[in-house]
From Swiss-Prot:
Record-given protein name: Membrane protein insertase YidC
CDD domains: 5TM_YidC_Alb3, EcYidC-like_peri
Domain of life: Bacteria
Similarity section: Belongs to the OXA1/ALB3/YidC family. Type 1 subfamily.
Membrane topology designation: Multi-pass membrane protein
Biological processes per GO annotation: protein insertion into membrane; protein transport
InterPro entries recorded: Membr_insert_YidC, Membr_insert_YidC_N, YidC/ALB3/OXA1/COX18, YidC/Oxa/ALB_C, YidC_ALB_C, YidC_periplasmic_sf
UniProt xrefs under PANTHER family: CYTOCHROME C OXIDASE ASSEMBLY PROTEIN COX18, MITOCHONDRIAL, OXA1
Entry function: Required for the insertion and/or proper folding and/or complex formation of integral membrane proteins into the membrane. Involved in integration of membrane proteins that insert both dependently and independently of the Sec translocase complex, as well as at least some lipoproteins. Aids folding of multispanning membrane proteins.
Length: 541
């Protein structure tokens, strides 16, 4: 009985640590300002760093004149004609705050912060280099809009080199999507062969948290190769060593809670995933593509894709079979993936994420009911054996060997497994933790309303009603649990304090997580009543 309570207590403490850790993370000062304007003159903030050169020495640039604006049903983008870099990206369908029209800004370039997506052509005849600067593209207009009934929008930029070679860089936007195709079309009208190589990189300012006492949410890089399906690459690791991994396909990304930006080169090309840190404190991660030889008079097309948007697993999987791993469920991903699928399935029917959370909680609790019943049955049998176990302690005293043998004989005679109540707890805990991470990582819950006063399941209950109800439900569950006379008084006190501790943690937690825990507790109370009623009929208490 005591060992079962110890495991339960350890499990609760472990979950409470996870909750405290995430509360700290969510309350940490954000390292990035979300409201800002794009810098029009970027001679000092916009370096010409390219991967084949020493990026610690940025080249001088011609001042940016007119940014090219692109508006679709999902994206509001600004492109710098110098180099053709995406220097601003707002997600039209994802608002900064619920109930307001201002879109969430993911990419931006301000006086104090840079988060942009660069791409260009390097190599022997590349038009982008740290030594010579970036190509200054021309566009026939500076404003592009995806019209009603139009599924794709092309934004062509043109650059004519000194040798007469024409380079066309085309950005292709798609209705309903957050991915952008970047296509280079090179028409070699010169008399000499050309050798070029496409690259794409994401640059972000390394800005530490303002408070060292807080644990920031993960904001950093990640990549995938043919050997490593998914790996995070922290800013501090990037500062220590540069990444340089050849691969077939692959991708490179920058992550933050709910959102991601990523370069996805062709899966059939030989690429190199690289990283670097610039002198100005910019972390760079990206890819270098295959080398192309273009004969005189020939035309060559080179393409890649860039994604800037939410961590939508379906959309990410369509671009790469490993890009959806940026939705990081941790070591229990194999449990979390089917749970997320079931959550999406329920929501597609009921149309309310709060109701979907309730349904999936009921489903999980229902599936685990046999284990729960076995757990309480075993605990009841152990309680009934306490008088006999106490007699054995008095009979054998300090002779632990004889006492252990006598206890095993007693367990065998009474058909009781002393660990019978522990196994169900150990099996249930991973499922509950996996469900916790699914609710924490699912971007679909951002700004998702439930009912009544809960207008956003991704933020705390404004009136703290759900956390208080959750604490009350834990208190009821605790009172329903019989306490063995032999239980250590310190353990009893810790268990008594647990509802209050959890209530304090949950005060600032997302409403969706609190709803899940509250419903789970209510179902557990009902299940306990049913189980205890059946046990009493069998003479077990």
């Amino acid at each position: 009985m005591e060992s079962q309570r110890n495991i339960l207590l350890i499990g609760l403490l472990f979950v409470s640590f996870l909750l405290w850790q995430q509360w700290q993370a969510d309350k940490a000062p954000k390292p990035v300002a979300t409201e800002s304007s794009v810098v029009a003159n970027a001679t000092t903030n916009h370096s010409a760093d390219v991967p084949e050169a020493d990026t610690s020495v940025p080249a001088a640039l011609t001042a940016t004149q007119n940014l090219i604006t692109v508006k679709t049903d999902q994206l509001d983008v600004q492109i710098n004609p110098v180099g053709g870099d995406i220097v601003f990206a707002a997600l039209v369908s994802h608002k900064l705050e619920q109930g307001k029209d201002q879109p969430f800004v993911l990419l931006e370039q301000t006086k104090d912060f840079t988060y942009i997506a660069q791409s260009g052509l390097i190599g022997r005849d590349g038009i982008d280099s740290s030594a010579k600067g970036r190509a200054a593209f021309a566009a026939n207009k500076t404003e592009f809009t995806l019209a009603d009934g139009q599924d794709t929008l092309e934004v062509p930029l043109t650059y004519v080199a000194d040798n007469g070679v024409t380079y066309t860089k085309v950005f292709v936007f798609h209705r309903g999507k957050f991915n952008v195709d970047i296509d280079y079309k090179i028409n070699n009208t010169s008399a000499a062969p050309l050798q070029v190589q496409m690259y794409g990189q994401i640059k972000q300012t390394i800005k530490p948290s303002e408070s060292s006492m807080m644990m920031p949410t993960y904001r950093g890089a990640a990549f995938s190769t043919q050997d490593v399906r998914y790996e995070k690459y922290k800013f501090e690791d990037m500062s220590k060593s540069n990444l340089n991994q050849p691969t077939l396909g692959g991708w490179a990304a920058m992550l933050q809670h709910y959102f991601v930006s990523a370069w996805i080169p062709p899966a059939t090309d030989s690429n190199t995933i690289f990283s670097s840190v610039s002198a100005g404190g910019l972390a760079n991660i990206g890819f270098r593509g295959a080398v192309y030889d273009i004969a005189p008079g020939a035309t060559q097309e080179i393409s890649s894709q860039f994604y800037v948007g939410p961590k939508d697993q379906k959309a990410l999987s369509a671009l790469s079979d490993t890009l959806n791993l940026v939705v990081d469920y941790g070591f229990l991903w194999w449990l979390a993936v089917p749970i997320h699928w079931l959550l999406m399935f329920y929501q597609s029917f009921v149309g309310n994420w709060g109701v979907a959370i309730i349904l999936i909680t009921l489903t999980v609790r229902g599936l685990l009911f046999p284990l729960t019943k076995a757990q309480y049955t075993s605990m009841a049998k152990m309680r009934n054996l306490q008088p006999k176990l106490q007699d054995l302690k008095e009979r054998f005293g300090d002779d632990r060997q004889k006492m252990g043998q006598a206890m095993m004989e007693l367990y065998k005679k009474e058909k009781v497994n002393p660990m019978g109540g522990c196994l169900p707890i150990l099996l249930q805990m991973p499922i509950f933790i996996a469900l916790y991470w699914v609710l924490l990582e699912s971007f679909e819950l951002r700004h998702a309303p439930f009912m009544l006063w809960i207008h956003d399941l991704s933020v705390q209950d404004p009136y703290y009603i759900l956390p208080l109800l959750m604490g009350a439900s834990m208190f009821v569950m605790q009172k329903m649990q019989p306490i063995a006379p032999t239980m250590d008084p310190m353990q009893v006190k810790m268990m008594q304090w647990m509802p209050m501790i959890f209530t304090v943690f949950f005060l600032w937690f997302p409403s969706g997580l609190v709803l899940y825990w509250l419903v789970g507790n209510i179902v557990a109370i009902i299940q306990q009543k049913i189980i205890y009623a059946g046990l009493e009929k069998k003479g077990l208490k």
